[in-house]
Amino acid sequence: MPELPEVETVRRGLEPVITGAKIVSVTLNRRDLRFPFPEAFSERLIGRTIMGLGRRAKYLLFHLSQNETILSHLGMSGSWRIEDDFLRERSSTVSKFVKHDHVVMDIQAKDGKVYHLTYNDVRRFGFMLLVDTRSLYEHPLLKKLGLEPMSNAFSGSYLQEVFVNKKISLKGVLLDQSIVAGLGNIYVCEALWRSRLSPQRGAFTLALKTECARELAASLAQNIRNVITEAISSGGSTLRDYIRTDGSLGYFQHSFSVYGREGKECLHCGIPIVRILQSGRSSFYCSQCQK
C-alpha cells in the first residue's frame, strides 16, 4: 500500500501541472472502485478549476473551485499519472497497466496546454469522494487523524504523551493513524531499526519519566522524520504496483535496512534479520540490535 512518502511524491509530481488547470472532460471506465463514484461525478467536475492539491496522511486532496474537494485514496495499488498527447500515446502501447485506467480527466493548464490526468488501480481498493471544502477536515475519514510526522508538533515529547499507559507494542501504536497520520509498515520497520528499538517493545516504556526514555523517544521521532524525508527524496518505494506520476519507479527500497531483508545480515551487527507477524503484518528487525 502506498504510504505517506509515496502519496506525497504523487502530490509533488502533479501539483505544478494541475494547479490552476480547468477540467475539460472526465471519462469513467467503470462505475466504482472500492466504493461507487459520487453521483453525477463526471458532470460535477467538468468546468471546474483545480485550485490546489493537498495531502492529509495517505489521502490526496484535489481542491476545486465552487468549494468542493476530491478526496482520493490510492488503496493498495492506485496511482495517478499526468501525460500530454505524446506520452499518452506511448504509454498506451507499452504499459501493461493501461487496461486498469479507471478515471481519465482531460485538463487544460494555465498555459493552454491539454494534459490527461489518469487514475490507475489494478486492485481497485482506492476510492474518490466529493467533499465540501468548507467542512473538509470534519469529514469522518480526516477528523480523527493524528499528527503528521513532518509537522513541527511531532517530537519526542509528543510520542511520550501518546505512549503513556500503552501496553501494546511500539509498532502497533505507530501504525495507529489517530496517533501518527500516514505511517505504514515499511517506514515504521525502518525507523525502529534506526532507533535500535524492537517492534515488540511495549510503547509505555518510552513514556517513563527517565532520561533514557526521553532520549529514546526523541531518537525515534527524529528517525521517523529522517526515513520519511529520505523516502520522499527518492520518490517513494516501488513495491508491487506503485509508480510515480511520470510512470517511473520509486527507489527508496534500495535503501531498506530491514524491510524485506529476512535472513540477510543486519547492516549494523551482521546477524540475520528476522521476520515476525504482528497483527497479521510482517515485522522485520534485528533481534540483537533492537531491544
From Swiss-Prot:
Gene: mutM
Cofactor binding note of this UniProt entry: Binds 1 zinc ion per subunit.
Sequence positions that bind DNA: H100, R123, K166
Active site location: P2, E3, K58, R281
UniProt-recorded name of the protein: Formamidopyrimidine-DNA glycosylase
NCBIfam families, alphabetized: fpg, PRK01103.1
PROSITE patterns: FPG_CAT, ZF_FPG_1, ZF_FPG_2
CDD domains documented for this protein: EcFpg-like_N
Cofactor: Zn(2+)
ZnF region ranges: FPG-type: 257-291
One GO process term, biological-process aspect: base-excision repair
Protein task: Involved in base excision repair of DNA damaged by oxidation or by mutagenic agents. Acts as a DNA glycosylase that recognizes and removes damaged bases. Has a preference for oxidized purines, such as 7,8-dihydro-8-oxoguanine (8-oxoG). Has AP (apurinic/apyrimidinic) lyase activity and introduces nicks in the DNA strand. Cleaves the DNA backbone by beta-delta elimination to generate a single-strand break at the site of the removed base with both 3'- and 5'-phosphates.
Record-linked Pfam families: Fapy_DNA_glyco, H2TH, zf-FPG_IleRS
InterPro entries: DNA_glyclase/AP_lyase_DNA-bd (IPR015886), DNA_glyclase_Znf_dom_DNA_BS (IPR015887), Formamido-pyr_DNA_Glyclase (IPR020629), FPG_cat (IPR012319), MutM-like_N-ter (IPR035937), Ribosomal_uS13-like_H2TH (IPR010979), Znf_DNA_glyclase/AP_lyase (IPR000214), Znf_FPG/IleRS (IPR010663)
